[in-house]
Amino acid sequence: MSIAALFTWMITILGGLILLVIWIIEYDREFQSAAATRLPVPVISAHALLAMGGLLFWIAYLLLDEERLAWAAVAILGTVAVLGLIMAARWIRVYRSFAAPGPSLTRSTTVPPERNFPLPVVVAHGILAITTLVLVLFTALGAGGS
């Protein structure tokens, strides 16, 4: 189960990196202002950095078999999940409001960069994140062995 958690964590980070690259490209290309995005830059940064840092704790746990490293990874991953939920809630509002062009959308309307996220990537990232959290938590609790 611990190796499965490692793989799901790495795939989840890969999906997150895809979303981050899309966001950076779109943000840099057209918007140049913090008001253009609905996702707080500190939340995006903390989410990404903590996810990678937590993965390092998980790898250290796998190598050293120290239970406290597993619990540190659980705590970090829990924080990452909360930040992810904050971003998901904000992204859903953007996705819905810009899904179908209506009378409120004109050529001058600024579309946030996160509107360009591919829906399948966002959904897969979320499902993998939940799966990773469950696997990491169950492994830390001792279910399924190492």
Model-derived regions: residue spans:
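Membrane-helix exit/interface motif
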Residues: 22-29, 53-67, 87-90
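Juxtamembrane boundary at the C-terminal end of a transmembrane helix
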Residues: 132-146
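Short alpha-helical packing/oligomerization segments
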Residues: 63-95
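Transmembrane alpha-helix entry/boundary detector in multi-pass membrane proteins
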Residues: 1-8, 33-49, 69-73
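N-terminal signal-anchor/start-transfer transmembrane helix
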Residues: 5-30
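Core segments of alpha-helical transmembrane spans in multipass integral membrane proteins
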Residues: 40-59, 75-85
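Individual transmembrane alpha-helices with interfacial aromatic-anchor signatures
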Residues: 111-128
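Cytosolic, membrane-interface loops and tails of multi-pass inner-membrane proteins
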Residues: 26-39, 97-113
